[in-house]
């Protein structure tokens, strides 16, 4: 009996192994046949039937998957117009099969067709770098770079304060008390919303953004905080203009047509300058007898050496950015490391614009302008009538008397068509002066959706 039982056990084991061997050899064929049927149904446009057959095929495959089945599932989602599932499947396949270029292209095309600018902004730069020869991705990238909105705001005047703040005069004048015409200016943030409006004819925001010199409708200047609480005034002096209060407590001021420095109590330093700028990072530029010097607040009274023929002042009213300044001596223009007192590079330029950021700066060669890195290397050959240094990856350039915008690849993203413009703000907003002389907005979609 024991022998019979042992023989039966052996037969059962052999049978089980035989069954497993049979299934292991027939399952791949069954799966391939089922997948082929699903593909045929998809190609014939029977997407629901294709989904049913694919599900059956996947059940034969078990927990494992293949690129072929995942790609078919992706395409069935698109055929069924299930765009959320289609997008998710593309993102998943990019993670699982990073070497398969087609999924990157399909995802970019999906975002482009749906005008999903945030989606494009989140992937295009990386995908162009990863697949530089993919024409579809490159074409969509270029088109997206040129995409912008135009808004007619019709402001009378706009001044650049920083990459997140502008000073605006909305109308030539407004009627005040007794219907007396008044000039009124206010500060707008990068998205165009008012952040400070004291009903004054002039505003000068401090370096740290916590206080403001304001000039009322009678021409009286005072220093106030953001809640309009009085910080300082000087009734003994009639200022014609006041600059930006530095974190060192010093600002440039004009009285009787002469430039001086004042402190946070609005007391005037007697020394007069041919020209000067506001303090930033503790440094300002002062001019005497046609020559310039870089000074700290404690050196304003004592400085006697003026080694530079020029010091470039940027649109914020400063001569220094991230410890660097653009200066000129007898050899030409160069970028100076202020802390070390040494040039950042050996070569010299005929002219350099001021640094607006740590990004490339505009240089002149002959009658044309191009762009150079802060280490002196040429980024773009001189080809424009005029140019401004880069901010936020974009720069204003002038051709045929009109201004447009180029990106970091020197691609003309906004064709020259405006009388003037300010630098590109953090939000992607740019203020441009139209043919009638008023200021409108354009919004660069790529920069707007960057974050």
Language-model regions, residue ranges each:
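Hydrophobic membrane-insertion alpha-helices, especially the h-region
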Residues: 5-20
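Residue-level detector of intrinsically disordered/flexible regions characterized by low predicted structural confidence
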Residues: 4-5, 261
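Residue-level detector of conserved, function-critical positions
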Residues: 22-451
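Positively charged n-region of N-terminal signal peptides that target proteins for export
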Residues: 1-4, 24
